[in-house]
Amino acid sequence: MKNNINILLINGPNLNLLGTRETEIYGDITLPDLLKNLEKRAKKLNMSLKHIQSNAEHVLIDKIHSSRKNINYIIINPAAFTHTSIAIRDALIAVEIPFIEIHISNIYSREDFRSHSWLSDISQGVICGLGLDGYHWALETISNRLIHLK
């Protein structure tokens, strides 16, 4: 494999509570444990994984803006911001970094208000309803797109 690929993983509000919050929906693996597993996989794929989790929209937007020059791809689980944040949408459009939107649960089989995403139509793809495996599939997809298909 060639050059290292820099990936930014963004986790939105309440994802800091993974492993303890609604485990029947989100599972019992904590965010630190998930990140440890993802970092191992990313390393095997010759990727460098940077991570941010915030419950504050402006913090995520600032991180997206600062990633413009040094990030090749974004994986974003916007959580509740999926359904409300035109500001995150605009930030992603502005930086022109390709991204994959992911959701642990199937947002289309839950409450009606969760079925609209402000990001899906501008993303490279959406992974939802596959649990924490969705994060791993996002890494594999990026590897296929940026490394193996060059």
UniProtKB/Swiss-Prot annotation:
Main function: Catalyzes a trans-dehydration via an enolate intermediate.
Residue sites binding substrate per the record: N77, H83, D90, I104, S105, R114
Subunit composition and interactions: Homododecamer.
Protein name: 3-dehydroquinate dehydratase
Keyword annotations of the record: Amino-acid biosynthesis, Aromatic amino acid biosynthesis, Lyase
Enzyme class: lyase
Active site positions, chain numbering: Y26, H103
Alphabetized PANTHER family for the sequence: CATABOLIC 3-DEHYDROQUINASE
Pathway annotation from the record: Metabolic intermediate biosynthesis; chorismate biosynthesis; chorismate from D-erythrose 4-phosphate and phosphoenolpyruvate: step 3/7
Transition state stabilizer, annotated site positions: R21
Keyword Lyase: yes
Assigned EC number: 4.2.1.10
Any Pfam family: DHquinase_II
Recorded name of the encoding gene: aroQ
Source organism of the structure: Buchnera aphidicola subsp. Acyrthosiphon pisum (strain APS) (Acyrthosiphon pisum symbiotic bacterium)
Family: Belongs to the type-II 3-dehydroquinase family.
